[in-house]
Regions:
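Glycine-rich flexible loops
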Residues: 1-293
Length: 293
């Protein structure tokens, strides 16, 4: 039987972690855990995630209605997007939403995390797309999020933040850490002249490692990024899924057919110009997040 009090303590611990790592400010962010098909624990609204204790945690049903909450506490207004994840992904046991500085800066700049630059990111995350903007606390966010749920375990929320989910609370939180670390490395490597991406053969090897590990969750191994026809990266020889065509900024082809994913979609001079603009754009957003001019 699930020990709810222990899970509440775990939620508080993760809340302290995301607060200590500057993934949230003030009362931002929210966390939820699935108990069963109709009972979920979630963080309350209007409370700093760094200072929660177990009695702060609320319980809701599959529609987000309150089952139990202590006086003075009510569920986060963002519980709607958590519920949509659980509805569409029965394998998911926990969802974490935060505003990590680097990942959120990419979300604000409209740049998905899709470049294969680090083994851990390729194995654990694959690509991290951007779900279209939705007004906070409305159904716009879950509605815009829904089409990504069958294929990804992490998304950036346009002009908002990041959302990760996995089989349990710790795994969902670790994905959030991975997303932020990936974003930071990508940003800083751009400052040093641009990241060196893995070639197709190395990507294939990393996908095979993931299969051998039997890692849970979805993984967009057959996703090929070609945002605006400019930055096309190596697809590992597997860039096909007709369903992916619904995602903005991506281009796909059939397995077994010629794939352009190992070719630059723009001349070197144009690519350099785009990289310079990218660095300037992200730097501006990061400085704003840090309160610097």
């Amino acid at each position: 039987m699930v020990n709810e009090f222990e899970i509440k303590k775990q939620i508080c611990d993760i809340g302290r972690r995301i607060y200590a790592r500057n993934m949230v400010a003030a009362n931002d962010g929210n966390i939820s855990v699935k108990l069963n098909d109709n009972e979920f624990l979630c963080t309350p609204t209007g409370v700093s995630k760094g200072f929660m204790t177990p009695e702060f945690i609320c319980k809701v049903d599959a529609q987000g209605n309150v089952i139990q909450a202590n006086p003075g506490f009510k569920p986060s207004s963002e519980i709607k997007m958590h519920m949509r994840v659980y509805q569409k992904r029965p394998d998911v046991g926990s969802v974490v939403h935060a505003h990590p500085i680097y990942a959120t800066s990419f979300a604000i700049a409209g740049i998905p995390l899709t470049q294969p630059i680090m083994p851990e990111a390729v194995i654990a995350l694959g690509c991290v797309p951007i779900a279209e903007y939705g007004t906070p606390s409305t159904m716009e966010i879950p509605d815009n999020l829904e089409k990504y749920l069958p294929y990804f375990d992490a998304v950036l929320l346009e002009n908002h933040g990041a959302l990760t989910w996995s089989t349990d609370l710790n795994a969902a939180y670790m994905k959030m850490e991975s997303v932020e670390f990936y974003a930071q490395l990508l940003y800083q490597s751009k400052l040093l002249g641009g990241p060196k991406e893995f070639d197709k053969e190395n990507i294939k090897k990393l996908y095979e490692i993931r299969r051998k590990f039997g890692m849970p969750g979805k993984h967009p191994a057959n996703l090929c990024q070609n945002k605006d026809g400019v930055n096309c990266h190596n697809c590992g020889g597997a860039c096909h899924n007709e369903d992916y065509k619904q995602f903005p900024g991506y281009q796909y082809d059939f397995v077994g057919k010629d794939c352009d994913c190992d070719k630059d979609a723009a001349p070197a001079a144009d690519t350099a110009k785009n990289d310079a603009e990218l660095v300037a754009q992200i730097t501006k957003q990061v400085m704003a997040q840090l309160g610097l001019k």
